[in-house]
């Protein structure tokens, strides 16, 4: 039971972190692209 609970809790945290990291990456990429276009 412990082994089943751990994997179930990990994906939720990974999904949330991945979503936040993805948003941050998109924001950084957007700023970089905007700077390149402006230059």
From Swiss-Prot:
Keyword Membrane carried by entry: yes
Principal location listed in the UniProt entry: membrane
TM annotation in the entry: 18-38
One of the record's GO cellular component terms: plasma membrane-derived thylakoid membrane
Assigned keywords, A-Z: Membrane, Photosynthesis, Photosystem II, Reaction center, Thylakoid, Transmembrane, Transmembrane helix
Cellular compartments annotated: Cellular thylakoid membrane
Family indicated by similarity: Belongs to the PsbL family.
Reported function: One of the components of the core complex of photosystem II (PSII). PSII is a light-driven water:plastoquinone oxidoreductase that uses light energy to abstract electrons from H(2)O, generating O(2) and a proton gradient subsequently used for ATP formation. It consists of a core antenna complex that captures photons, and an electron transfer chain that converts photonic excitation into a charge separation. This subunit is found at the monomer-monomer interface and is required for correct PSII assembly and/or dimerization.
Record-given protein name: Photosystem II reaction center protein L
Species in which this protein is naturally found: Crocosphaera subtropica (strain ATCC 51142 / BH68) (Cyanothece sp. (strain ATCC 51142))
Gene that encodes it: psbL
